[in-house]
Amino acid sequence: MSKHVHIQLPDGQIQEYPKGITIKEAAGSISSSLQKKAAAGQVNGKLVDLSFKLEEDAELSIVTLDSQEGLQVLRHTTAHVLAQAVKRLYGEVSLGVGPVILDGFYYDMKLGKSLASGDLEAIEKEMKNIINENLEIKRIEVSYEEAEELFAQKDERLKLEILKDIPRGEDITLYQQGEFVDLCRGPHLPSTGMIKAFKLTRVSGAYWRGDSKNEVLQRVYGVAFQKKKDLDAHLHMLEEAAKRDHRKLGKQLGLFMFSEEAPGMPFYLPKGQIVRNELERFSRELQTNAGYDEVRTPFMMNQRLWEQSGHWDHYRDNMYFSEVDDTRFAMKPMNCPGHMLIFKNSLYSYRDLPIRMAEFGQVHRHEYSGALNGMLRVRTFCQDDAHIFVREDQIESEIKEAIRLIDEVYRTFGFEYSVELSTRPEDSLGDDSLWEASERALARVLEELGLSYEINEGDGAFYGPKIDFHIKDALKRSHQCATIQLDFQMPEKFDLTYINELNEKVRPVVIHRAVFGSIDRFFGILIEHYGGAFPVWLAPIQVQIIPVSHVHLDYCRKVQAELKQAGIRAGIDERNEKLGYKIRESQVQKIPYVLVLGDHEEQENAVNVRRFGHQQNEHVPFQTFKDKLVKQVENRGM
């Protein structure tokens, strides 16, 4: 038997090592600097600890702290340090789970006292002590019974509950650092001293295991990075995000509200409705030019429709129901089935296709109260859904046109975006060959358009693969909005047909398409992206006119009337307040243009223009200002 293993590195080189060499030792053989930066290893695609021993031939890559995978390991270990610090400080603590999330981590726990934000400083101090102790982190494999006995002795009832979900007979992995032991799959850093930059950010409540029937635990959130400068940059971003929080700005700018009478369901105030109307108008213009017909379907439809479509199996736990005339109806969680019924209502020839059907459809999906987040996570929202019914030979050309439409929308708002191709999920419908052909078709379209994309394994819709578009906002946060989905299943379920050139009935293919996704969510994203300072074409009030004194009101009203006639949303601040106060108020409301009008402006039929975010005022003829503004609005300029 060979005493060596052959290990293939990422560059294709094959190295021979003694059997049983650890990942850390292998990294050191490549370079000492790589060993210092190493956080974990990836053996045949699986993340493992640096202490993992190579006992057979394998592919190996070293995961460094500056990689995304390395940061996840760092953050996971920091979550364990958090839990250890809390147990040291507060004694009787029952630990839940402590996963890695985007940019950070959290740990759920049951304490004898309620934590407040003021407690975070003390916890951070103890975490730094643990880091300075540079405790070795050991992976320990135990039997189910040994793990059960250990956590029973420690009175860790939540860990015991997690254990119950693991089949008896399976090996259990624990991680130990000093006196602290946790149930965990890992991997982790080799020692606590490798953590250099972290910050606890907030405390909140969370249902144990996300179930509202369970007790509420305390959740402590934190962030961690390889370097302090990265942490500082992230904390600065969080400060900016707090300033741009759409919930705060929505209230400040009078855009929307929520009420306990309809939890998770937004009320649009007049100014907010203006913005929403502009978004819909923009979309309608583009869709009309692209050959879409707009339709409207009922909010509530028979339960059997959702069973027929397949949505019942995937959405029933999140649907709202009502009984009418002894028949059970459901508020629609999706617009798709209604569009299938509309298509089925008419007879189509192959010459009629594609049929492009669009709707601003209001849908309802129940979310747990703890998951609600302003406009970003609601229980009812408007989806800009379209369904394109095509022949098979039209699939790729129609997807290309849908992508071009999405690109035009996002460029108008100044969004960069990335693309994902999401493949077959476990709960999918249909045969393998159809899925493979569909995935190849979507990939071919993206490649022909020169769009780079990532594969998102297993995240397709249950009826077909999809292309997802992730926009980046001003703070470089990613939001998945637009989607294009290919569907061979729905036409089968609804027995949809058209007449082909041989006078035979054949199935169309359906392309599902959304650009904004949820208009309500997109609105919330826009508020944060622009910090509430909308482009002039979207702004609820585009021009605020302020008289120097009441004697200038007539001229102000004349200017307002002409602007309104030109389609500009213009207001006048006629309040009996000081000029400086009125100007500051218009800045707080983030109005794009403020016109301060006095004797000089009236005599010359001019305006004194203050643009939001600009230091310099400009004195220009009124007609020049109006013409320039009208053109800016028409072009939907930034």
From Swiss-Prot:
GO terms for biological process: threonyl-tRNA aminoacylation. Residues 245-535 are annotated as: Catalytic. It catalyses: tRNA(Thr) + L-threonine + ATP = L-threonyl-tRNA(Thr) + AMP + diphosphate + H(+). It is found in: Cytoplasm. Zn(2+) binds at C336, H387, H512. Keywords: Aminoacyl-tRNA synthetase, ATP-binding, Cytoplasm, Ligase, Metal-binding, Nucleotide-binding, Protein biosynthesis, RNA-binding, tRNA-binding, Zinc. Its main location: cytoplasm. GO terms for cellular component: cytoplasm. InterPro entries: aa-tRNA-synt_IIb, aa-tRNA-synth_II, aa-tRNA-synth_II/BPL/LPL, Anticodon-bd, Anticodon-bd_dom_sf, Beta-grasp_dom_sf, TGS, TGS-like. Binds 1 zinc ion per subunit. It holds the Pfam family TGS. Residues 1-64 form the TGS domain. It comes from the Bacteria. Signal peptide: none annotated. Belongs to the class-II aminoacyl-tRNA synthetase family. HAMAP family: Thr_tRNA_synth. Homodimer. PANTHER family: THREONINE--TRNA LIGASE, CHLOROPLASTIC_MITOCHONDRIAL 2, THREONINE-TRNA LIGASE. Catalyzes the attachment of threonine to tRNA(Thr) in a two-step reaction: L-threonine is first activated by ATP to form Thr-AMP and then transferred to the acceptor end of tRNA(Thr). Also edits incorrectly charged L-seryl-tRNA(Thr). This is Threonine--tRNA ligase 2. The gene is thrZ.
